[in-house]
């Protein structure tokens, strides 16, 4: 039954007294309490708060997806104005009616793209299916529109990507596919749950601008769920701050940033890492720990030098990793993705080397190739003086005790059938390191170190938020006391306060045990805080590498400068340069089979600071 007289003028969505709970061991656990808000047509409402504060379950409740997961939802009012201007009460819609509402009138970009995309269908089919269902388009028309949407979200070789499967794409590319799918039907309301978490800063800037452009064209209301206050400052009109399932403050973006009233809001803003905060400092520095009771910043002491002189613990020389692309009636390999091309670097005990670059630049593939999770076609990988790229699988398994990996997608890397205690204890069992009671005590200690409770060991992955699942993955990686940890976007899914705690934990472990980190990230403020050295990757090659201070304070390569310039700043009044969308052809690392790409030539421009000389392929970086 329509409720056209109950929506205020200009509103496209209105929620009153939303309560969400889950049953656990015959006990009702409240996740959201008495939440009320509205969204105007053409407005962006940012919902911010810590991991587990109720942001994502609120979004799932609006999409009517919680009932299937056992969620108990009660609400006085949940009104939506559809694209046809009809106003409906979402809580009264049947499952069949909601299938027509989702996608056409309300769309959602989910936090974890690997678990949101169907692994058995090509991404082009998945985007086209939504277009066919909601726009009555033919298959051919839908595929043309799907290709156009992939172009819009800055995916190179979009025509090729249409026929690829989710597991064949990087995390950032999967996230862009999700964004393309959500925007393809031009909904009245877009709910974006951490949509730029897996994206590098340059693509993030493009996506934020794309959302704003489409929002203006369609007068689309946007609910933007994020923990990145820089993104909030850039995109939001109003901000809703949530803490422990309740709204503690709401107001315009200027009010929240310049005159926050609630202690938690002030603490949240104080914990935001600022690019440039490490200027003049040579070594990594702990994040200030911010509490609700004491939101004032207390600068911690500078970290002492942890890098051990002598031989590197890990040495990589001319690493090459390529993936075949098949085509034609005979399904022959005709082209290859040059994911990693002649990459070389050293990693010393106690050092953090950060790999930064765009999604698809080869960062994650480099990390996976070091553990032989993907096979390389050339180069040498030497760990503690021993070549590991030629080891047998049996010897390689023993070596993995000393090199651990923290994956980008926490839900996909945890077994949904195992409790998280079993997931953390599994490496200890595989390597036969600790008996039962000692292993259980180790699990409890690890959970506490990453900000969780020992009793959480009996829960399953689906019972945690995205940020909490990432903490579980970090605890699992730390279980074996490894010498090297490869952290692939290990803190990208965490809110600012927990992110600071995890970075401080990693620094403490590095100081105490001499762990070396290969830190793969697109968060330049975090990279600046944790790194000893930084390597910038572009199209599978390192184009700049050197001490963190030199790279951040005196970037030499135009791509490095572009990365730093694209970092969002937590200041809503700051003027941002307008970026031209799709102003040029996107470069690609896909080449004909057998075609060799010239390796960039690195030149020394300072102590330990090497830069590739700009070539024609970097011309697209002009501002």
From Swiss-Prot:
Record has Ribosomal protein as a keyword: no
Membrane topology: Peripheral membrane protein
Annotated ranges, domain ABC transporter: 15-269, 314-564
Subcellular location: Cell inner membrane
InterPro entries registered for this protein in UniProt: AAA+_ATPase, ABC_transp_ATP-bind, ABC_transporter-like_ATP-bd, ABC_transporter-like_CS, Oligopep_ABC_C, P-loop_NTPase
Keyword Repeat attached: yes
Keyword terms, alphabetized: ATP-binding, Cell inner membrane, Cell membrane, Hydrolase, Membrane, Nucleotide-binding, Repeat, Translocase, Transport
GO aspect biological process, one term: peptide transport
Main location: membrane
NCBIfam families: PRK10261.1 (NF007613), PRK10419.1 (NF007739), PRK11308.1 (NF008453)
Family: Belongs to the ABC transporter superfamily. Glutathione importer (TC 3.A.1.5.11) family.
Subunit structure: The complex is composed of two ATP-binding proteins (GsiA), two transmembrane proteins (GsiC and GsiD) and a solute-binding protein (GsiB).
Name recorded for this polypeptide: Glutathione import ATP-binding protein GsiA
Annotated organism of origin: Escherichia coli O6:H1 (strain CFT073 / ATCC 700928 / UPEC)
Gene responsible for this protein: gsiA
